[in-house]
A protein has these predicted regions:
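Beta-strand-loop-alpha-helix segment that lines the small-molecule cofactor/substrate pocket
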Residues: 68, 74-75, 79-126, 141
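Contiguous beta-strand/loop segments that form the cofactor/metal-binding neighborhood of enzyme cores
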Residues: 183, 187-262, 287-302
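Predominantly a Rossmann-like dinucleotide-binding segment in NAD(P)-dependent oxidoreductases
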Residues: 125-211, 327
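N-terminal Rossmann-like dinucleotide-binding module
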Residues: 1-48
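C-terminal helix-rich "cap/oligomerization" subdomain common to oxidoreductases
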Residues: 1-2, 68-71, 226, 295-333
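Hydrophobic residues in well-ordered beta-strands that form the structural core
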Residues: 55, 94-95, 119-121, 150, ...
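C-terminal glycine/acidic-rich active-site capping loop/insertion
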Residues: 124, 245-312, 330-333
Length: 333
């Protein structure tokens, strides 16, 4: 239990409503205010969660008791809203993706450093026990030298998904949202980068095959990683029925297959019945972004995904888009 409660405010009450509920359930955190442009939505959330509400972001930022802001607005606004909060002296966490533009991520990182505040990105899969154990197994060399990583995400999103939301249609527009790689696929891009490390080269293709949208509903890419591994990506939102998501990790000594958040396969050449349970998760490891922010703000711990780490997936999906536009391989250095 923390020695004091840290005051939180949440901006945007779509997915942000779930994070506001998480704040209420987390020891050491206190939800003080929620903010949404829709007065009825903000009022209803405040009544449920027993906190204040406002339709004015500036008003919430003026509150000295609100130390941490969670940003859950359209993707193209993430860093602008984060920067506004950090300039007001607030610590910030942003829902995925960090933004849709690398330069905006860079600006937010600079502001966080200048203002001396915490900047984190909410990639919930980083807190999952299985994913932590896979990462530990890879770091321990259980698969040996990594050779290949394949990501397949084949989901179903109907036209109403893109036409709806608030503001209406924002998920379909390049200015406010990326497509299947930047929106749905970014969780898995982040896992790939976490598991294998930085990408060296990207050859990508993106297009819109089945929806009336500006953004893409399919992205494909071939990757090389700095550790020598190769990789491939398919991220699509027109697969009916949804075929889910899968990550296959192949090394010299064996293979791990991650399927929809579960362990599909763990086989090693020279060991029968290997188990990821050999890798223990520290008891004090944060279980979600709220616990992570409390640890970062109160004890100075580094969040699971800070600004620099959150930027990496934005750089990757933008490289896929750039390669698709130019028809050339993008070298990320």
């Amino acid at each position: 239990m923390e020695s004091r409660e840290i005051g939180f405010g949440i901006l945007g009450l779509g997915m942000g409503l779930n994070r506001a509920r998480d704040v209420v359930k987390t020891p050491g955190a206190r939800l003080l205010c929620v903010c949404d442009l829709r007065e009825d939505v903000a009022r209803k959330a405040a009544e449920e969660l027993h906190c204040d509400w406002t339709t004015s972001y500036s008003e919430m930022l003026e509150r000295k008791d609100v130390e941490v802001i969670g940003v859950y607005t359209p993707s193209g606004m993430h860093c602008d809203h984060a920067i506004q909060a950090m300039e007001a002296g607030k610590h910030v966490f942003i829902t995925k993706p960090m933004d849709i533009r690398v330069e905006k991520c860079d600006e937010a990182i600079r502001v966080a450093g200048r203002r001396g505040v915490v900047l984190a990105v909410d990639f919930q899969m980083r807190y999952d026990g299985l994913n932590r154990r896979i990462k530990a197994a890879l770091d321990a060399g259980r698969l040996g030298r990594l050779l290949l990583a394949d990501l397949r995400m084949k989901w179903w999103r109907d036209q109403s998904y893109y036409d709806g939301g608030f503001p209406r249609g924002w998920r379909s527009l390049r200015g406010t949202e990326g497509g299947s790689a930047a929106n749905q696929g970014v969780h898995f891009l982040d896992l790939l980068l976490w598991f294998l490390g930085p990408v060296k080269t990207v050859y990508g293709m993106s297009g819109t095959l089945a929806h009336r949208i500006e953004t893409e509903d399919i992205s494909m890419a071939l990757l090389t990683f700095h550790n020598g591994a190769w990789g491939s990506i398919i991220a699509a939102t027109f697969s009916y029925p949804s075929l889910g998501s899968k990550i296959e990790l192949t090394g010299e000594k064996g293979t791990i297959v991650w399927t929809d958040g579960k362990l599909g396969l763990y086989k090693l050449k020279e060991e029968e019945n290997p188990s990821l349970e050999e890798f223990e998760i520290p008891r004090d490891a944060p279980k979600n972004i709220i616990e992570d922010m409390i640890s970062a703000v109160s004890r100075g711990a580094k969040p699971a995904v800070d600004g620099e780490e959150g930027r990496k997936s934005v750089e990757l999906f933008n490289a896929i888009y750039e390669s698709s536009r130019t028809g050339k391989i993008v070298d990320l250095g």
